[in-house]
């Protein structure tokens, strides 16, 4: 991990590392957090080896691009609000391009998942019960089909190393209260809707995604945090491949880490330590991440 004068490491997740000013006691005693996106890649609740070259920069670029367009309160520290110093000038050169300065929030233990299309674990559950997370769906749907309306299917955010757990909306009420649960659902569906509309204009489908929210410590405002609509948190498909002339597999060719998931599913039984990713899988995944950023942002 990179040593950075003036900052101290306080936490590492699967992909991101958190730092606070060296004078702060910790996350609860600071108004500024440096979030550094690494090149680590995770799947099936495991961090894999090797990482994906350039992934941290691509995730950060995409999150910043989306935060600027989604019209939702977010945890970024505006560049002009730090006294006597612009926010971007506080970011150490060693992690420039893969870092964000953010406000600390009281995070909710909920993964706010929105599905616009039936696929992944939702498709598996639908085949058994014709529902997803307790929400009944029409009969006769196939893998990759667009849902009549996007659905909100929350999950309990497990500690690092444990499995996230799909939960009912009623369970979210028990965890965070009825008012907060309702706001999380409303915000998640609204942000997904705005993001999906923007992406479709650029020839990309957001099949599903997950958001994380926290409460502002001073005002209590529910605020979008962590990453947003990245290749790690979302399934992205090429809109040009959705016509009937393509096979289901071709229609769902993704701009995300589905390549990694598919390779692991075919080469690992999910017991013990996952195998190292082959160079070809690493290169293909990096290429898809870059292609998405280029498609969406034009950069």
From Swiss-Prot:
Species the sequence originates in? Leifsonia xyli subsp. xyli (strain CTCB07)
Species classification = Bacteria, Bacillati, Actinomycetota, Actinomycetes, Micrococcales
One Pfam family of this protein, by short name? SAICAR_synt
UniProt lists the family membership as follows: Belongs to the SAICAR synthetase family.
- What name goes with this protein? Phosphoribosylaminoimidazole-succinocarboxamide synthase
SUPFAM superfamilies referenced in this protein's UniProt entry, alphabetically: SAICAR synthase-like
Q: What is its EC number?
A: 6.3.2.6
Specify the pathway: Purine metabolism; IMP biosynthesis via de novo pathway; 5-amino-1-(5-phospho-D-ribosyl)imidazole-4-carboxamide from 5-amino-1-(5-phospho-D-ribosyl)imidazole-4-carboxylate: step 1/2
- CDD domains in alphabetical order: SAICAR_synt_Sc (cd01414)
GO MF terms, alphabetically ordered: ATP binding; phosphoribosylaminoimidazolesuccinocarboxamide synthase activity
Could you tell me which Gene3D superfamilies the record lists for this protein? Answer: ATP-grasp fold, B domain, Phosphorylase Kinase, domain 1
Which InterPro entries does the UniProt record give? SAICAR_synt/ADE2_N (IPR028923), SAICAR_synth (IPR001636), SAICAR_synthetase_CS (IPR018236)
Q: Which domain of life is it from?
A: Bacteria
Which reactions are catalysed by this chain?
A: 5-amino-1-(5-phospho-D-ribosyl)imidazole-4-carboxylate + L-aspartate + ATP = (2S)-2-[5-amino-1-(5-phospho-beta-D-ribosyl)imidazole-4-carboxamido]succinate + ADP + phosphate + 2 H(+)
Q: Which major enzyme category is it?
A: ligase
Name a GO CC annotation attached to this entry. Answer: cytoplasm
Which HAMAP family does the record match to this protein?
SAICAR_synth
Q: Which gene encodes it?
A: purC
Q: Name one GO biological process term.
A: 'de novo' IMP biosynthetic process
What keywords would UniProt list here? ATP-binding, Ligase, Nucleotide-binding, Purine biosynthesis
């Amino acid at each position: 991990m990179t040593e950075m004068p003036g900052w101290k490491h306080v936490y590492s997740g699967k992909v991101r590392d958190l730092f606070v000013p060296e004078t702060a006691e910790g996350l609860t005693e600071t108004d500024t957090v440096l979030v550094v996106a690494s090149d680590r890649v995770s799947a099936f609740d495991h961090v894999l080896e090797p990482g994906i070259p350039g992934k941290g920069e691509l995730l950060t670029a995409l999150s910043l691009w989306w935060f600027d367009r989604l019209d939702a309160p977010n945890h970024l520290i505006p560049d002009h609000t730090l006294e006597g110093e612009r926010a971007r000038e506080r970011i150490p050169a060693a992690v420039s391009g893969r870092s964000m300065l953010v406000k600390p929030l009281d995070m909710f233990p909920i993964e706010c998942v929105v599905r616009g299309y039936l696929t992944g674990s939702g498709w598996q559950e639908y085949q058994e019960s014709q529902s997803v997370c307790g929400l009944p769906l029409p009969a006769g749907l196939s893998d990759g089909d667009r849902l009549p309306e996007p659905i909100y299917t929350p999950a309990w955010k497990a500690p690092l190393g444990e499995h996230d757990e799909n939960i009912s909306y009623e369970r979210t009420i028990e965890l965070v209260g009825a008012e907060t649960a309702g706001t999380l659902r409303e915000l998640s569906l609204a942000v997904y809707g705005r993001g999906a509309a923007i992406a479709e204009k650029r020839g990309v489908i957001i099949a599903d995604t997950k958001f994380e929210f926290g409460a502002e410590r001073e005002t209590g405002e529910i605020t979008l945090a962590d990453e947003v609509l990245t290749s790690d948190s979302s399934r992205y498909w090429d809109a040009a491949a959705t016509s009937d002339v393509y096979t289901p597999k071709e229609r769902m060719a993704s701009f995300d880490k589905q390549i990694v998931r598919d390779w692991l599913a075919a080469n690992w039984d999910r017991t013990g330590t996952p195998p190292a990713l082959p160079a070809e899988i690493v290169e293909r995944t990096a290429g898809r991440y870059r292609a998405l950023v280029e498609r969406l942002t034009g950069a």
